[in-house]
Swiss-Prot record:
InterPro entries listed in its UniProt record: RNA_pol_sigma_r3/r4-like, UPF0122, UPF0122_fam_protein, WH-like_DNA-bd_sf
Family under the similarity heading: Belongs to the UPF0122 family.
Function: Might take part in the signal recognition particle (SRP) pathway. This is inferred from the conservation of its genetic proximity to ftsY/ffh. May be a regulatory protein.
Species assigned in the record: Halalkalibacterium halodurans (strain ATCC BAA-125 / DSM 18197 / FERM 7344 / JCM 9153 / C-125) (Bacillus halodurans)
Name used for this protein in its record: UPF0122 protein BH2485
Gene3D superfamilies named in the record: Winged helix-like DNA-binding domain superfamily/Winged helix DNA-binding domain
Superkingdom of the source species: Bacteria
Length: 109
């Protein structure tokens, strides 16, 4: 399992277009630019609690999107299969082994 920050960054990458502008800004500042809650609150002239609440709600939304759409899970699975393919090519695997890996890529939903 990815650590929380890395996971949120990935989820944000996949689903940011589904967020409001304010949610995108808060998440970007917090996770990508490493701003503190206080710095974000000062930037937007709101309370730290308002920023915290917004970020927590947005995190929950991102997790919900992932639960329904599984874009990150599919990306991770594709990456895993591609790594296996690279290793198979390096060790000069049989064409059957390579085809099996390619088919597993092809059948990913």
């Amino acid at each position: 399992m990815l650590d929380k920050t890395l996971r949120m960054n990935y989820l944000f990458d996949f689903y940011q277009s589904l967020l409001t502008e304010k949610q995108r800004k808060y998440m970007s500042l917090y996770y990508l630019d490493d701003f503190s809650l206080g710095e974000i609150a000062e930037e937007f002239d709101v309370s730290r609690q308002a920023v915290y609440d917004n970020i927590k709600r947005t995190e929950a939304m991102l997790e919900e999107y992932e639960e329904k759409l599984s874009l990150l899970a599919k990306f991770e699975k594709r990456s895993e299969i591609l790594q296996q393919l690279k290793e198979a090519v390096d060790k000069q695997a049989t064409s059957e082994e390579l085809m099996a890996l390619l088919e597993s890529l092809d059948t990913l939903e």
